Amino acid sequence: MPDSDEVDLGPGTLLISAPMMQDPNFRRSVVLLCEHNDREGTFGLILNRELDVSLGDVLDEYVTYDPPLYMGGPVQRETLHYLHTREDIPGGVALPGDMTWGGDFEAVQQLAKGGDAAPDNLRFFLGYAGWGPGQLEGELGEEAWIPAPGAAEFVFDTDPDQLWRAILRRMGGEYAVLANFPDDPRMN
């Protein structure tokens, strides 16, 4: 496992929850970090928790584009966030791995109404994962998370139900072994 002092926690980093994590909010989750600094802490979005609601369930104006929503995290679950790979949504925060977080919501609405938006280039989240200053570093020191570089393919092209295992397998070595860790080791 990488030394927590050597880990880059910058935007675009993925956090893969350790197999033994039992917190139901983060168990077998993959979090994309969007913002991290020593003064304010860390902001991220859980990538692999699809909700049983769609965008049209929370925003009436999306009748032609109604993708599933994802739980971005347990903090402020009433807030809407989005990741995309589109160049026609200005104002977002560019993330490594060819992704953008946020941007001009009016442009998003126009794309959705015009039928130009698709789940393979625009994904919506309710809430976010947040850590106070130093909190995430402490959790990394406890080996609760495995950091990895992010890429748009993990957000838009990989089945969310398989994402946790897929990233660990791709990391290879000891991480690939963790991908096969049973959901409940007591049942093994």
Swiss-Prot record:
Species classification: Bacteria, Pseudomonadati, Rhodothermota, Rhodothermia, Rhodothermales
Organism: Salinibacter ruber (strain DSM 13855 / M31)
GO CC terms, sorted: cytosol
Protein name: UPF0301 protein SRU_0495
Database matches in Pfam families: DUF179
Family statement drawn from the similarity comment of this UniProt entry: Belongs to the UPF0301 (AlgH) family.
